[in-house]
């Protein structure tokens, strides 16, 4: 088995090794070394990337026999090569993974829930728990987790003997029996884990919950740690500052100011809908019963009002009642209704005539078209014909 240098020193950034094997693997090459600093994918954490000799390391996987590095160029078996991991990426992941251990340990000790899923993604960290917690409860955990960071307690890794392991209490999703690597965050968590971690909690930096949702009878939470949490804070602070300036209110008053705007918008929409309803009544007064079709091209701001107009107009038309809104330049949206024709069957003919797309029920279809207004009116003036 490949010697795991990342187990010995999680902060080491480069190393030298001997190439034991290099096999073509599609467009990549599978390289096995006598020792490696590259962490293979496992435990919810993606593999390290970086450079190895003159090749880029694209992925790393572990098998029962060896750790396999997938590179974009071949390496010569027997050669000594220098490798370097993508350190900023590794450190970010160590911050996140160690932060997850603290949170999971606290959730278990405070509320008795177990971590049943973990994924360290490119932009966020996702954890699943086998029970529900409220947002205030998660904020309590967040406060305790950040207190752990401020205390700067050590994080230790070890491979205890089977005898000692049998006497230990630790978290684990799997039933492990040998070569169990235990990660201990002193006073907060003891967990079986194969991944690199920071050396002390102070290296983690800020820990922040960003969301929670119900998931498979429990909850799924997302967090950010360290550098990622700082970036997120800067971006959100900039957004709040911009909103504060646009609304001419203090940053602490942005939420109530936005709520006032939303209330005003709701009132304006209600008033506009009432005006549209009155306008529909006036439109209908101009219509007369006809054995042919009715076609109106007008401004309909409310889709509900547009449908109401068609519902009323189709009672007067022996053919169809067609309502269009839009412009020749940007195209039109339409709703067409009929009490005498099967519009689902007629949709193909209608759309072909007005360069449209759409469909619906036998009594009503809706869609869009690009034909100009004159062509639309000319078609419906003669539709459906005899």
Q: What is each of the regions a protein language model found here?
A:
Residues 1-386:
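A glycine- and charged-residue-rich anion-binding loop/surface
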